[in-house]
Design a protein with these regions (language model features):
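Conserved, single-site charged/polar hotspot
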Residues: 1-178
Length: 178
């Protein structure tokens, strides 16, 4: 049966839709929450695409199960990848990045700084930073621009689909997951 499905812990669930292309699924509040699994059996990447409209909010659920937004994009298709040395399609990503020294109070401030230097904003342990590049080894990263870092246990990168353009990073070690 055609429709919009979600993979859940209890199996595949139909969210809505029908056999007709012009009939949109009835998704409560127009929101589908997507989480990532971590561990030895986790996938390296997940592709997300919106058929109608655009935009994704990035965040985590706090201890009260309230969504805390830490970033966003207007893109209609993104790939979320584990921040490791990984190849997704024709694109190769590395686990090492150059982190600039400044911290920022908001996603918007970090995004503005990232735009001026060719980097991307990162939510890093409760604050915002800017990182540049994605390198397969620490030696490949140009350390003169900042500090060479690698991501934590649950670090992920959000990439514009089918490109190597990193839009956002999330790195809270093993304390939080995007």
């Amino acid at each position: 049966e055609r429709g919009v499905y979600a993979a859940t812990a209890s199996g595949t669930q139909l969210l809505g839709g029908s056999e007709y292309d012009d009939e949109q699924p009835n998704i409560p509040n127009g929101i589908v929450r997507v989480g990532l699994a971590f561990g030895s059996t986790a996938l390296d990447a997940v592709h997300l695409q919106i058929k109608t409209g655009s935009g994704f909010a990035f965040g985590y659920y706090d201890s009260d199960r309230v969504f805390q937004s830490v970033g966003s994009t207007a893109e209609s298709a993104v790939t979320v990848i584990a921040d490791t040395n990984v190849t997704v399609g024709d694109s190769a990503f590395g686990a090492y990045h150059v982190q600039l020294g400044d911290t920022y109070a908001s996603f918007d401030a970090a995004q503005a700084a990232a735009n001026s230097c060719g980097g991307y904003p990162v939510y890093y342990n409760g604050s915002y930073r800017v990182r540049i590049g994605s390198y397969r080894s620490a030696d490949d990263a140009p350390a003169g621009q900042g500090t060479v870092v690698s991501g934590g246990a649950r670090s992920v990168l959000v990439v514009k689909a089918s490109t190597e353009q990193i839009l956002f990073g999330f790195d809270c070690g093993s304390t939080r997951s995007l």
